[in-house]
Amino acid sequence: MTRVLVVDDAKFMRVKIREILEEANYIIAGEAADGEQAADLYKKLRPDLVTMDITMPVKNGIKALRDILTFDPKAKVIMCTAMRQQRIVTEAIELGAKDFIVKPFEETKVLEAVSRVMGH
């Protein structure tokens, strides 16, 4: 079973993503509300996949992505963002994010991204 770390500063978004993934039989390994928590939890939990917001307090998703990939260059991270700025998305992909989801999103978009990244 695929274990996922869900990262978003908005609790309702973490809940929404968790519900979508659990309904599809993914296991939620943990949740974080900022990038610093995300990087720390990644090191402790070693999930198979991370869904991560970009705009967060303390440490944003781009900085957390860098930290996670420094620790584990093979980490699979899907960035979630309400920002439609191509520059930010391009930066995340160039750093090593495997995919991205634009908020607001439909359940199918989340599952399609997870499936692409996990190869199923």
Swiss-Prot record:
Domain of life according to the entry: Bacteria
GO-annotated biological processes: phosphorelay signal transduction system
Pfam family, one: Response_reg
SUPFAM superfamilies cross-referenced by the UniProt entry: CheY-like (SSF52172)
InterPro entries: CheY-like_superfamily, Sig_transdc_resp-reg_receiver, ST_Response_Regulator
Residue ranges occupied by any Response regulatory domain in the UniProt entry: 3-118
Key words of the record: Phosphoprotein, Two-component regulatory system
Modified residues (4-aspartylphosphate): 53
Name of the protein: Protein CcdB
Gene that this sequence comes from: ccdB
